[in-house]
């Protein structure tokens, strides 16, 4: 660990089309093998499909979907006296967004629709309506944290 100063978070340039930093981060998470233009095309197509199906604004549906997937608490392993406990800890805001986006992309990749854009749009629409695999993942994480509430005093 550096002793001098804390190194800050790198600033991410906002997305060129919608001027959203959150969307730019999402594109980066979706990107495979450095193919950013392909990832952007997929995200923009998915946003168009979402806006068409829901009748709402592109970014509104996107943000609502992420809001429904963001975890408030998670469990971290902590070793105490030879046994490992799953300790519930609060999730920092930056990590909340990162986890939510990662879960949405993961869930979309496992779906059955034809193109990635369609899969992503379907998963986002499901997430905005509080259903779908990514929301289930968040519920599982919350349930795990709730089940291990007894070990909360081991927080660090």
Swiss-Prot record:
Matching PROSITE patterns: RIBOSOMAL_S7
Example of a GO MF term: structural constituent of ribosome
Superkingdom of this protein's organism: Bacteria
One BP annotation, GO: translation
Family annotation (Gene3D superfamilies): Ribosomal protein S7 domain
InterPro entries (alphabetical): Ribosomal_uS7, Ribosomal_uS7_bac/org-type, Ribosomal_uS7_CS, Ribosomal_uS7_dom, Ribosomal_uS7_dom_sf
Any GO CC annotation of this UniProt entry: small ribosomal subunit
Alphabetically ordered keywords of this record: Ribonucleoprotein, Ribosomal protein, RNA-binding, rRNA-binding, tRNA-binding
Family according to the record: Belongs to the universal ribosomal protein uS7 family.
Subunit structure: Part of the 30S ribosomal subunit. Contacts proteins S9 and S11.
Function summary: One of the primary rRNA binding proteins, it binds directly to 16S rRNA where it nucleates assembly of the head domain of the 30S subunit. Is located at the subunit interface close to the decoding center, probably blocks exit of the E-site tRNA.
Stored NCBIfam families: rpsG_bact (TIGR01029)
PANTHER family registered for this protein in UniProt: RIBOSOMAL PROTEIN S7
HAMAP family, sorted: Ribosomal_uS7_B
Protein's name in the database: Small ribosomal subunit protein uS7
Organism: Vibrio atlanticus (strain LGP32) (Vibrio splendidus (strain Mel32))
């Amino acid at each position: 660990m550096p002793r001098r100063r804390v190194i800050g978070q790198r600033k991410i340039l906002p997305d060129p089309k919608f001027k959203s930093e959150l969307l730019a981060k999402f594109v980066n998470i979706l990107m495979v093998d450095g193919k950013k233009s392909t990832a952007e095309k997929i995200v923009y197509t998915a946003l168009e499909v979402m806006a068409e199906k829901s009748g709402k604004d592109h970014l509104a549906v996107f943000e609502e979907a992420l809001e429904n997937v963001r975890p408030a608490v998670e469990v971290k392993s902590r070793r105490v006296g030879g046994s490992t406990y799953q300790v519930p800890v609060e999730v920092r805001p930056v990590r909340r967004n990162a986890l939510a986006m990662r879960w949405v992309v993961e869930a979309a990749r496992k779906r059955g629709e034809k193109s990635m854009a369609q899969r992503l749009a379907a998963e986002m629409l499901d997430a905005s309506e509080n259903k779908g695999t990514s929301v289930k993942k968040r519920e599982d994480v919350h349930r795990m944290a709730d089940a291990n509430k007894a070990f909360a005093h081991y927080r660090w």
